[in-house]
């Protein structure tokens, strides 16, 4: 049986790169400062935009911007420790431009920094948290990724590891 797809849409963290230790360190510090009641390492939080998690955990609108800026700062400081998952460099370097992209829940700077730290190319069609109104589990990131590649969503395959991303891909 053969399967054909026009476009390949990859999540980044956990699919192409391993940033778990760096993210865990950043979120542990952030939670100790802003939300000590939160167990950030719970898998249900994986794959979602930091801004959405901060909004969920910080009830004060006045504190949201400060808290959101802080997690962005902490994650950026640890991005350089990101490594490529086995086979990711060979895979992405073998794909033709315009046939694949990354749809990440990270902000633009963090998404690029993690890809570059891992030695992976940054696709021109990169989709980040800032590009969509609704992040995963909503389908917006993957719909935009397909659109940027010029393909119908049903002609694309999504590679995803987090339940929020799988829900986005299936929506």
What do the PLM-derived regions correspond to, one by one?
Residues 10, 159-160:
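Active-site flanking residues adjacent to catalytic metal/cofactor-binding acidic residues
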Residues 101, 107-157, 163-170:
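Substrate-recognition "cap/lid" segment bordering the active-site pocket of phosphatases
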Residues 82-86, 136, 160:
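Conserved phosphate-coordination/catalytic loops
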Residues 2-96, 107-109, 120:
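N-terminal helical cap/lid subdomain that shapes the substrate entry/recognition surface
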